[in-house]
Regions:
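Single conserved hydrophobic/aromatic residue that forms the stacking wall/gate
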Residues: 200-208
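Residues immediately flanking
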Residues: 54, 78-80, 100-102
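Short beta-strand His + acidic residue motifs that chelate non-heme Fe in jelly-roll/DSBH
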Residues: 58-60, 82-90
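Generic protein-terminus/edge-of-domain signal
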Residues: 1-67
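A hydrophobic/aromatic-rich effector-binding and dimerization subdomain
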Residues: 87-150
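An amphipathic alpha-helical interaction segment
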Residues: 133-185, 189-195
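Histidine-centered metal-chelating micro-motifs
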Residues: 74, 79-85, 105-106
């Protein structure tokens, strides 16, 4: 098993991808603008939100494996490990990443609220699969954050950045809820059809 890389700062994360650091505590990375990388497992001491635009196969996330398909999001909290084993090849990153240091949230409402977003926990046990419309909303939120990072820092910067991070997190809660509701409806429909088939099979037996 390959060595685990520790990611302690936003600058270190940007250097890993080969992109410019616009802000010491927050980064939005567009994969196509990053350098080709070898796969590795990483210990995150940051919050990271990953959106993939290509099929990356299985990723190790904690003790679980996830099918990280196109249009999939994963959410990482400080202290969590994620990544794929090095296969010896360089790969061009795809998709988007939002990373932010937990200290950036201090003295903001999001510092208290962040623990309420349960998808940052290993216990969430499921990636978020986006529709095309949901993906568009996520990218709009990331673009807003990136635009603010490119703006000269002033007294409004921190609140605008954290507000837009919260907006993205709130949308993702909605999308997770829709994902679970959709699955429950599908499972209920499958169960109903299965029960009807059992009734259909048993009817000739009762008649005989």
């Amino acid at each position: 098993m390959s060595e685990i890389m520790k990611i302690d700062t936003v600058r270190q994360y940007n250097d890993y991808f080969g992109v410019e650091t616009l802000h010491l505590s927050v980064s939005v990375i567009e994969g196509c603008k990053a350098k080709p990388l070898r796969y590795c497992r990483k210990l995150y001491n940051l919050y990271a939100i990953l959106l993939k635009d290509t099929d990356c196969g299985q990723l190790k996330y904690g003790q679980s494996c996830y099918d990280y398909r196109q249009g999939t999001m994963l959410f990482l909290a400080p202290g969590q490990i994620m990544g794929s084993e090095d296969d010896g090849r360089l790969h061009q990153p795809e998709g988007w990443v939002l990373a932010f240091h937990p200290e950036f949230l201090q003295k903001t409402p999001l510092a208290r609220l962040i623990k309420e977003y349960s998808y940052f926990s290993y216990n969430a046990n499921e990636a978020l699969h986006l529709s095309e419309q949901e993906r568009k909303i996520v990218l709009e939120c990331m673009e807003k954050i990136r635009t603010e990072l490119q703006h000269p820092i002033d007294k409004h910067s921190k609140s605008l950045i954290t507000d837009n991070i919260k907006l993205l997190l709130d949308y993702c809660i909605r999308f997770y809820d829709l994902q679970f509701i959709t699955r429950e409806n599908v499972n209920h429909d499958i169960l109903t059809r299965f029960e009807l088939s059992l009734i259909h099979i048993s009817e000739p037996t009762r008649r005989s």
